[in-house]
Every structure is written in structure tokens, then in C-alpha cells.
A protein has these predicted regions:
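Extended active-site neighborhood of metal-dependent phosphoesterases/phosphodiesterases
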Residues: 69-174, 189-209, 215-263, 267
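Active-site glycine-centered loops adjacent to acidic/histidine catalytic or metal-binding residues
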Residues: 34, 61-62, 99-100, 139, ...
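Hydrophobic h-region of N-terminal signal peptides that target proteins for export
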Residues: 11-21
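Residue-level marker for buried hydrophobic side chains located in beta-strands
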Residues: 29-31, 57-59, 96, 176, ...
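C-terminal structured domain segments across diverse proteins
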Residues: 167, 180-182
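A short C-terminal boundary segment appended to hydrolase-like catalytic domains
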Residues: 249-291
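Bacterial N-terminal signal peptides that target proteins for export
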Residues: 1-9
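N-terminal active-site segment of His-dependent metallophosphoesterases
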Residues: 20-75, 184-185
Length: 291
């Protein structure tokens, strides 16, 4: 009887550990940005994602170069849906963020796209997504970058404050996802004053990691107010790395993507080159949830 109990317990332990390990293996988040122009680089990055171990992918904005005005806009098919078809066919969940080029059209079109493509997620231009105690906040930073969108800012700020307060005790690790960075070690300038004020007040010092596109590089810019800024924006038009990278930072203009694995309050991340599928840079961030 004791032997049977031991065997049964061992079987349960094996099944539990096996499921635990599988969940950890599947907990791989990847990030690309600025992949809206049809060219060989875009194809290279899409192919790398299609054949990657990513279980969830986030697009960091500038989904197309010209923006799309409706669900029937040819730009949508030609610059996004057709080039990304090999990846979309994998049914890997694909979460969208909108950038400044998407605002050249109507970025809410992607809400309609998400209804037609089960693997695409875009419930709004700003939203949250939780995976257990890992919390993602997706933001629309273009409305802070462009003065003529000032009337749209209040609703997002109020929403953000409410959600941070609501989730504060539930998030062991927090990631904010948006299009525009606050600063850069490359040739892009710091965010303009109105955008910088928003990011300084509401993002840096609140989240563990802030992941963006816009600057067409792969970059680990280090911490500011204990928030790590990462950039993954070489989906189609790499360019803008410094001649010499500052010590402790990483900044290259190679096609690729960012890969993150989060366990508890620890995130291990790697920048992957699309051409050779090699690790270009890796690092670790210990988080504090939402502050």
C-alpha cells in the first residue's frame, strides 16, 4: 500500500513538474517594431519570428509606413497582412501597439483587424494584458508626441492611473509597451518636452521595463528611475546607432527582435539577430512590480 502511494505521489509530482516546465518554456515574449515597409529586411525579420520559439509577440508600432484609413485600405494588406502571413499562420498571439505612422491613418482600424484575425489582439489603442502576476500596459504615446492630439491625453492618463492603482498589489513584474522612447544613446533626440513629461511622471519610476520602437535600433539603454528602457525597432528600416556605444549599453542597427522570459520578479532578455538567429546581447532585470 505504501509503495503504491509513493508511486502515485511520484506520478503526480512528475506531472506537476512537467506542466510547470512546459509553462515556463512557453513563457517567451518577443517584441518587434517599425516593420511597416515591404523590403528584404522585413521579410528577414518575419521569417525569424515565424521560426522562433516565441510564444507571444508584441508589435511596438508603425505597423505600416503610410497608415491605414479603413479595413479595406490596400496598405493594410500590402504592408502588413500579406508580408506577415507566414507568421500569422502560426497562430502565435500577436499584440499590437500603434505608432506615429499609424496615426497617419486611423489606428482604430486595428481593432477591426483583431476581430477578423483570431491571433491578433488590439482591443484599444491603450490597454492592459496580464499573464498571471506579469502585467503589460500598452500605451499610445503619439498623442503626447504630437501637440494636435492634446485633447486625447486626459482620458489615457486617467485610465493609466486607475489601472496602476488597481493592479499594484497583483503584479510581481511590470512592463510598459509603447512606440516612443524617452532617451537614446543613438542619433535620435530625447523625447520632446510634452512626451518627456508624460513618461517621467507616469512610466519611469512606475514600471520595471519600458519597451519601445521608433528609434530604428536594437538597444538596451539601461535604467532611469529604476525602470529599464529597451528598444526593438529594426523590423524594416534599421539605422541610427552611435559610432561608439556608451559603456554598459547596447545599441546596434541590425535586423532582429527582443526576447524576454519572466520568472517571478526576474526577467532575462536577449536581442536576437534575424540573419544568423544569434544572441547579440543578453541581460537580466530584477523588478519590483508596480511602484
Amino acid at each position: 500500500m505504501i509503495k503504491r502511494s509513493v508511486k502515485f505521489f511520484s506520478l503526480l509530482t512528475f506531472l506537476f513538474l512537467n506542466q510547470f516546465l512546459q509553462s515556463k518554456e512557453n513563457n517567451i515574449y518577443c517584441f518587434i517594431g517599425d516593420a511597416g515597409e515591404v523590403n528584404p529586411t522585413q521579410s528577414l525579420v518575419v521569417d525569424a519570428l515565424t521560426n522562433s520559439e516565441c510564444s507571444i509577440v508584441w508589435h511596438l508600432g508603425d505597423i505600416t509606413q503610410l497608415g491605414v484609413k479603413s479595413i479595406n485600405d490596400t496598405e493594410l494588406q500590402e504592408s502588413f497582412l500579406n508580408p506577415f502571413k507566414p507568421f500569422l499562420d502560426t497562430n502565435v498571439p500577436f499584440y499590437l501597439t500603434v505608432g506615429n505612422h499609424d496615426h497617419k491613418g486611423n489606428p482604430k482600424v486595428y481593432m477591426e483587424v483583431a476581430k477578423q484575425y483570431p491571433s491578433i489582439h488590439h482591443p484599444n489603442n491603450f490597454y492592459t494584458k496580464r499573464f498571471g502576476d506579469l502585467c503589460f500596459f500598452v500605451l499610445d504615446t503619439t498623442i503626447f508626441d504630437k501637440l494636435y492630439y492634446f485633447h486625447k491625453r486626459g482620458s489615457q492618463i486617467r485610465w493609466l492611473k486607475d489601472k496602476v492603482k488597481e493592479y499594484k498589489d497583483d503584479c510581481e513584474f511590470s512592463i510598459a509597451v509603447a512606440h516612443h522612447p524617452l532617451f537614446s544613446s543613438g542619433d535620435r533626440d530625447r523625447a520632446n518636452p510634452q512626451l518627456a513629461i508624460f513618461l517621467e511622471r507616469h512610466i519611469f519610476g512606475t514600471f520595471d521595463i519600458y519597451i519601445t520602437g521608433h528609434n530604428h535600433v536594437l538597444a538596451d539603454e539601461g535604467d532611469h528611475k529604476k525602470t529599464r528602457q529597451l528598444i526593438s525597432a529594426t523590423g524594416a528600416l534599421p539605422g541610427g546607432s552611435p559610432i561608439e556605444t556608451e559603456p554598459g549599453k547596447f545599441n546596434v542597427e541590425l535586423p532582429g527582435y527582443l526576447k524576454i522570459i519572466v520568472e517571478g520578479n526576474s526577467a532575462r532578455y536577449e536581442f536576437i539577430g534575424a540573419e544568423k538567429r544569434e544572441i547579440l546581447w543578453s541581460n537580466i532585470k530584477i523588478g519590483n512590480g508596480l511602484r
